[in-house]
Regions:
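Short amphipathic alpha helix immediately N-terminal
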Residues: 25, 117-138, 142, 167-168
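Short, charged helix-capping/linker segments at alpha-helix termini
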Residues: 14-23, 33-52, 147, 170
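Structural recognition of an alpha-helix C-terminal capping motif at a helix-to-coil junction
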Residues: 34, 48-55, 59, 68-80
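N-terminal module of bacterial RNA polymerase sigma factors
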Residues: 1-31, 116, 142-143, 167-170
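Arg/Lys-rich amphipathic alpha helix in sigma70-family domain 2
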Residues: 62-66, 76-95
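Internal acidic/polar
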Residues: 3, 84, 88-116
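DNA-recognition helix of helix-turn-helix
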Residues: 10, 83, 131, 137, ...
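Sigma70-family region 2
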Residues: 14-15, 41-42, 52-69, 88-90
Length: 170
């Protein structure tokens, strides 16, 4: 889904169109989930944050400026809530339980292989490029790093994933 479509849906949501909100959710949920998961690495927590992201979108839609990058706005909300969740974990010393859950997750899906094989930064770059359609330049701006660095990390990540998938097939 391109940025204009997301912007149009957010504008409709601001006008009170609930059907537009449902379409927005359906079209953006996969990428948003993967983005949040890249921070939390726990399905249950990611699902909780996902609910909060879309609730926050609904409640704060009046703060969205029509004609801007709606995808970036959604991802910024997702990032903020994911980071809030991480800080809660630190306060509760939840780290050991998270490690246990992460070990229990099987490596059957692409997302799990990505999470296992790639660093957090590489995972975000691949997710933002493949699932969200961001250009390397845009990812560089979001992550405060040069476009060339994003491009080389992306290529290296894809090479790692190809190798991991070959090994998984054997």
């Amino acid at each position: 889904m391109d940025e204009r479509q997301i912007d149009k849906l957010l504008t409709e949501v601001a006008r009170g169109n609930n059907a537009a909100f449902e379409v927005l959710y359906e079209k953006t949920k996969r990428g948003t989930f993967s983005f949040i998961y890249s921070y939390l690495k726990c399905y249950e927590d990611t699902e909780d944050v996902m609910q909060n992201v879309y609730l926050k979108i609904k409640l704060n839609i009046d703060k969205y400026t029509s004609g801007t990058n709606g995808r970036a706005w959604i991802l910024q909300i997702a990032k903020n809530l994911a980071l809030n969740e991480l800080s809660k974990r630190k306060r509760v010393e939840y780290v050991d339980e998270v490690k246990t859950r992460a070990e229990e997750i099987s490596c059957g899906s692409i997302t799990e292989i990505m999470q296992k094989e790639l660093s957090e930064e590489e995972y975000r770059i691949v997710t933002l490029h493949i699932l969200w359609g961001y250009k390397h330049r845009e990812i560089g701006e979001m992550m405060n790093c040069p476009t060339g660095t994003v491009t080389s990390k992306y290529k290296r990540s894809i090479k790692k994933l190809k190798q991991a998938l070959k090994e998984a097939e054997q």
